[in-house]
């Protein structure tokens, strides 16, 4: 077994698991994936041994435990600098960190009303006004980055931590049929066409269990 492990939850529903998993994949580290449910007492007890916060994702590398998604990304950038998880330019790097932080701490209306559900396709879904404000801000971020750094990813020709942070939003937009500009839709298509995202989506679609409360429209 690899000395590096990443603890995650459902690939269909867990957006934070997707973010952490993408970051580790992009870093090039060889790792073992541990998937645990988070909705039972036994599962939470098991998860506590792997993640002090009892949250996913949680990375264990060379006896070091890192359990916050942004912290995982920063740690990976330090131990795998050749992966270029952050832009090399100082100004671009600051911009990348800023929009990663905005995703990490914001957009609560989007999270609550459009939960990630990769297997679902919600036709005619009505987006609430507060969630639409989040969508508008996210697409503004994307358009600014794509215009400034020329794509196809948010900071140019290579995926960075920013793309990992916003990948679950891509999946949400596709699930709920969110109306997007051609540039933003092209970005979504670029993300889901990457080998790592194809791998994740295939695994998500193969998951046997559905969480009933996440299978309804809000």
Language-model features and meaning:
Residues 204-218:
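Acidic/histidine-enriched, glycine/proline-rich intrinsically disordered or flexible terminal extensions
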Residues 49, 193, 202:
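Phosphate-coordinating loops and pocket residues in cytosolic domains that bind phosphorylated ligands
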Residues 37-39, 187, 205:
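Conserved beta-strand edge residues that scaffold enzyme active sites
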Residues 6-8, 31-34, 157, 174-175, ...:
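Short, contiguous strand/loop micro-motifs
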Residues 103, 107-195:
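GST-like fold's C-terminal all-alpha helical module
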Residues 42-44, 192, 210-211:
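Short Asp/Glu-rich motifs
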Residues 1-128:
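GST-like domain detector, emphasizing the conserved glutathione-binding G-site
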Residues 15-16, 21, 67, 86, ...:
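Tryptophan-centric aromatic hotspots in well-structured domains and transmembrane helices
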């Amino acid at each position: 077994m690899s000395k590096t492990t990443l603890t995650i939850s459902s690939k269909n529903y867990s957006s934070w698991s997707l973010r952490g998993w993408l970051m580790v994949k992009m870093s090039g580290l060889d790792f073992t994936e541990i998937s645990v449910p988070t909705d039972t007492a036994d599962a939470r007890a098991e998860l506590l041994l792997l993640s002090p916060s009892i949250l996913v994702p949680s990375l264990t590398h060379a006896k070091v435990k890192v359990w916050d998604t942004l912290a995982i990304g920063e740690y990976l950038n330090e131990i795998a600098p050749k992966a270029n998880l952050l832009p090399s330019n100082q100004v671009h790097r600051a911009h990348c960190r800023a929009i990663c932080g905005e995703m990490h701490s914001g957009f609560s209306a989007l999270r609550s009303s459009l939960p990630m559900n990769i297997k679902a396709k919600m036709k005619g879904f009505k987006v609430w006004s507060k969630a639409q404000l989040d969508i508008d801000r996210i697409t503004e971020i994307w358009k600014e980055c794509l215009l400034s750094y020329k794509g196809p990813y948010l900071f140019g020709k290579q995926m960075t931590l920013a793309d990992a942070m916003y990948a679950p939003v891509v999946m949400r937009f596709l699930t709920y049929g969110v109306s997007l500009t051609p540039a933003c839709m092209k970005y979504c298509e670029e993300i889901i066409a990457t080998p790592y995202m194809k791998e994740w989506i295939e695994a998500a679609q193969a998951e046997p269990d559905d969480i009933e409360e996440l299978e309804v429209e809000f």
